[in-house]
Amino acid sequence: MRKTKTEALKTKEHLMLAALETFYRKGIARTSLNEIAQAAGVTRGALYWHFKNKEDLFDALFQRICDDIENCIAQDAADAEGGSWTVFRHTLLHFFERLQSNDIHYKFHNILFLKCEHTEQNAAVIAIARKHQAIWREKITAVLTEAVENQDLADDLDKETAVIFIKSTLDGLIWRWFSSGESFDLGKTAPRIIGIMMDNLENHPCLRRK
């Protein structure tokens, strides 16, 4: 039984990686389940045993990346000296390092930013992406709340605006890097952008409640 469960998990992982490669090559809307099954070297029936549809597969892939990031955050928290605000900085720096060095993270975010077509056909996939993005907004809000409590940030910080500012900065940097054909050195640029962003969160009056 244990061997069967292990084999099933390996097959599921193999299917997710096949989906990642196919989505990366063709985009989500133009990829069929049959193409994913062929890329994985399994029957369509075997794919359906693990995933109900393409949206279910994308959701599992999204969750896999989120779990990886969560594990890295936990490791950063264990390794870093200081509170959640310091950990947040380390987490962001490590995220952009992985974006360049980890093939799975690179391809997934490339799909998310460039190949996740906003069409009626793709509505369910877009809804899944928004669901996960909402979860990360909540996590960022929690980081800001703790930073305020620890006096790393001002007690009159406008957290709603701050979350929008953070997401806009980070998403904008990722999109710009991908859409420009990686025309600038992300390894040099990301730490500077993160530093500017965090300095503004700590000091800029426009991020305080009116």
Curated annotation (Swiss-Prot):
InterPro entries: DNA-bd_HTH_TetR-type_CS, Homeodomain-like_sf, HTH-type_Tx_Regulator, HTH_TetR, Tet_transcr_reg_TetR-rel_C_sf, Tscrpt_reg_MAATS_C. Controls the permeability of the cell envelope to hydrophobic compounds such as antibiotics and detergents. Represses transcription of the mtrCDE-encoded efflux pump by binding within the mtrCDE promoter. Also negatively regulates the expression of farR, by binding to its promoter region, leading indirectly to the positive regulation of expression of the farAB-encoded efflux pump. SUPFAM superfamilies: Homeodomain-like, Tetracyclin repressor-like, C-terminal domain. The MtrA and MtrR-binding sites are sterically close and addition of an effector increases the affinity of MtrA for the mtrCDE promoter such that MtrR binding is negatively impacted. Signal peptide: none annotated. Changing H105Y: In penicillin-resistant isolates. It comes from Neisseria gonorrhoeae. Keywords: DNA-binding, Repressor, Transcription, Transcription regulation. This is HTH-type transcriptional regulator MtrR. DNA binding is affected significantly by increasing the NaCl concentration. Disruption phenotype: Deletion of the gene results in increased resistance to antibiotics and detergents. Residues 9-69 form the HTH tetR-type domain. Residues 32-51 bind DNA. Homodimer. Binds to DNA as a pair of dimers. GO terms for molecular function: DNA binding.
